[in-house]
């Protein structure tokens, strides 16, 4: 049967309503999985009511080689059956992003509708989103779940300030967010005063640009819901791809009738950016960052997250970009993610972290460091033969370099 | 696992069928269920839980050839294990309500696969110790008796489970030098030589194992029951009456200053049959004298009173010397205080050494060390193994070292702002002195 083929996949996702109606599945046809989804819904219900008078929620199920993780929202349920070695937290994050993507496509009105009409068939509403959902899963799986930020491209501060000036000179009051970005990286972001940008919203926008090829062929006007801005309605996105380039200018407005204004604003920004196109392309071309560019020879890989900027930088690859430099083969990156998770894990419990945390894990073939404090989080990989005192010095030097380099690494607030 | 009470526990055999000619649906459901705790749970709930457990086992078969191990909800952890052919045991642990915005929960620090497995194994093995395999109980004639035994046993298990404080299942070895050890061995061999009915012996002094001739798993079972974590004191406090028809776990006579606990004593002749892995069922005698416990496993299924008296006379003669040999060494080591907090565990011979300063281990530190240990165990199964780790949290520094994949050593220092290399230096200095006979790789 078709569904048994999809069960043999290494990582399978199911989205369905609380009434057991399939909404989306990563592999196979939702229709073929109706019986299976029905049984999963029954399982979830039984565990919710396992003891009479007590409400509970199923989180995950384990066998020796499979983890099945559940995310239950008000009206939609998400399940992942994972046979590779990803951590439970990482899988849960992917489910969370799937949910964010569904809300991004339909707004939270889908929840209201499904609560009032539990038997509603929501499959058609998600039509055409398969590749974007799949892309979202792949990108999220490459992220560290505890890094709550996005990873911009590196650019000298003065050049980024020039882009900021261009935006400042041309922005329209209807614009909530403005971006100069590629499918993988954010180069510059503008936000309206007193409006923040949540990293999940940034990821959703990036996913939109990446997944819909049609946005690259012509100037587009498309709705998107950014749940952390507001999950009740859409923002309207004006997107254009600069000529002979892979640089997008993206403007978002909460005014559905602001197409003309955003078009004018966007064209003006594009015209002024034309003179900086080479500079911008240079900043993209140097991504991902080779580790040697940070002047610390002994480090094989690092991830640095600045809490002030809410942004991160990573060497060797980037979660949004599936390119791996020779210094970081893909298989090793997957192993390293698991090791970073392990190094970071204790600090996720309030009883063990009060603003200062260090962990050094020494494997036979690698040494992994995690430093977490109120300013930043650093995870680094080095050779296992490096003594701990040398490792401390290296990390200290790396942090110093990165701190100094922050204005060029990250987009200013 | 500390602190988590049992919400429910049940044993079932999905292959059992009702015996009546036209069984009802309820009869089908009831006959599968061998035992359910708590017994006052509504029948409907009991049947649902068994059905759900069966269903979950079948559900995961669609994705994995390996059996279902555990189910984690926000408030509970369900552990499922097939303990014998067609017999499943399910234990549901209650973690209480700890609302959290994030996915992780505090219980995740304690619900590692090996910890959950140990809980189920512990339940099963301690029942097995006194009553043998569940498959020995014939369906349906022996099942009411089995149910009574499980009922009696499970109540004790439920009270006992959250009080278990040890991190590792192993042996605390008695500190004896070579000469003293050989003297003790001589004494024990005299007993075995004189009494050919004695199949195996185990000698324990104040909760520390001195010697055992049993295979490792059997030794661990008996040692855990009688000695680990001073368990004999818990057994005495239980004050369970000596009912030969009830579950024998925890039913012991008062510990005399010198005499038999299992054997002939003021309560009569009590010689339980014990079932141990790799050994045929045998009778167990337990002789106590001062801080010593001497276990004798007898070959024969019957141990007459005369045999017990003959053994008593031998032990009167031989034990004082054994105790004297051990006592002087033991007191010397006991009175010395370790300068560091550490915990040592050897996965091969299951030796545990916990420094005097690390006793007792508070709950937060317990969870920390437990999770570090789980990370070290986990890594050997997947990638290149984790051999050393140093972690600073706000409650302590912990450094763990794994030596030759079998030994784990944990060092604990108070929290401080010292850099990690300074902490490591301090620990290495201590370790190179204290563990000088072991290659630690430090």
What are these regions (language model features)?
Chain A
Residues 1-413:
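Intrinsically disordered, Ser/Thr-rich regulatory regions of eukaryotic membrane-trafficking proteins
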